[in-house]
Amino acid sequence: MQVSIACTEQNLRSRSSEDRLCGPRPGPGGGNGGPVGGGHGNPPGGGGLGSKSRTAVVPRPPAPAGALRESTGRGTGMKYRNLGKSGLRVSCLGLGTWVTFGSQISDETAEDLLTVAYEHGVNLFDTAEVYAAGKAERTLGNILKSKGWRRSSYVITTKIFWGGQAETERGLSRKHIIEGLQGSLDRLQLEYVDIVFANRSDPSSPMEEIVRAMTYVINQGLALYWGTSRWSAAEIMEAYSMARQFNLIPPVCEQAENHFFQREKVEMQLPELYHKIGVGSVTWSPLACSLITSKYDGQVPDACKATVKGYQWLKEKVQSEDGKKQQARVTDLLPIAHQLGCTVAQLAIAWCLRSEGVSSVLLGVSSAEQLMEHLGSLQVLGQLTPQTVMEIDALLGNKSHSKK
């Protein structure tokens, strides 16, 4: 099916940082588990709403065009936004589990991070079947079960694509979407996830099959919404058109890499999809895998992320000419950060949050100190005036421009 769209598809010339780090995809370990306590019941499926009628309908005034409704949590200061144009409210900062849960940090540290995040208003926790070969999901599930938080008080997202070594254990076939999600639920010890993401596009699976399978898992109560991750704008539009053609459920969100040096997709392509079809954005890697921290100066210090096993690509990036240029730009941003009374990491995260259509930014941290620093970016967001953003753009020299 050919779909025309004004969005410019991003040219992916190299593998993303997640691809490089994950490397060959090992199969997830098995896992037993039952429903988490807390009194929640099965989520509603995709059926009708019943026959009750209302005597009068009072239309609500429309929201400002392109505006994400934002509110602030009582006692925490956390800000909440709608996930795209859906009704789901998510914290504008979420906690990711990539390369940390089940691998880089201990289970005790993982529990501390989840607790600190939850107590500071974070309600969005993201994982994937491939993270640490399933151990990240298992660790997250064990913590949630031990904490006993109300299931209705947080949002769990997982991603499906790379499951195991067998041909039928990866990709976006109907078989793997259903069985992969069931495996994730077993490891998470949950009855459902709030959002299931297709963790990349799959040219070997027909789009209709993908959309029908996602609709099926939602109708079966295994997920409440579905989204995409690292899909092109054209692919997302095709999925939406397929859903509308066959009365299926369209995606509500795209997960995309976004930081000072990765801008075009989130700034130029996804806002158009947000306005046209209501697809929101959840972004990841706001610090470019720690490159935007001012800790590197063409060198790789001891005990930094670039020295961790599996991060050889980051070490090479830091020492490359392109990496050195990016580090120079980070150094140039330090005066702006000092003027705002924040760290360059806080500035970078707040900068990501200001993009149109972005519902949440996922944080990847390995200590409570890092998490608290990153949560402080919310105070910086209000200080990002148009003038400040223009100064940042001038220093970066890579602002995306419309081709209209």
UniProtKB/Swiss-Prot annotation:
It is found in: Cytoplasm. Its main location: cytoplasm. One of its GO terms (cellular component) is voltage-gated potassium channel complex. The active site is at Y131. The keyword Nucleotide-binding does not apply. Keywords: Cytoplasm, Ion channel, Ion transport, NADP, Oxidoreductase, Potassium, Potassium transport, Transport, Voltage-gated channel. It is an enzyme of class 1 (oxidoreductase). Its EC number is 1.1.1.-. Residues 1-78 are annotated as: Disordered. The keyword Transmembrane helix does not apply. InterPro entries: K_chnl_volt-dep_bsu_KCNAB (IPR005983), K_chnl_volt-dep_bsu_KCNAB-rel (IPR005399), K_chnl_volt-dep_bsu_KCNAB3 (IPR005402), NADP_OxRdtase_dom (IPR023210), NADP_OxRdtase_dom_sf (IPR036812). One of its GO terms (biological process) is regulation of potassium ion transmembrane transport. NADP(+) binds at residues 97-98, 104, 126, 199, 229-230, 255, 284-289, 295, 305, 364, 366, 370, 373. It comes from the Eukaryota. Pfam families: Aldo_ket_red. Coiled coil: none annotated. Predominantly expressed in brain. Strongest expression in olfactory bulb and thalamic nuclei. Not detected in heart, spleen, lung, liver, skeletal muscle, kidney and testis. Residues 1-14 have a biased composition (Polar residues). Regulatory subunit of the voltage-gated potassium (Kv) channels composed of pore-forming and potassium-conducting alpha subunits and of regulatory beta subunits. The beta-3/KCNAB3 subunit may mediate closure of potassium channels. Inactivates Kv1.4/KCNA4 alpha subunit-containing Kv channel current but not Kv1.1/KCNA1 or Kv1.5/KCNA5 channels. May display nicotinamide adenine dinucleotide phosphate (NADPH)-dependent aldoketoreductase activity. The binding of oxidized and reduced NADP(H) cofactors may be required for the regulation of potassium channel activity. Forms heteromultimeric complex with alpha subunits. Interacts with KCNA5 and KCNB2. Belongs to the shaker potassium channel beta subunit family. This is Voltage-gated potassium channel subunit beta-3. It comes from Rattus norvegicus (Rat). The gene is Kcnab3.
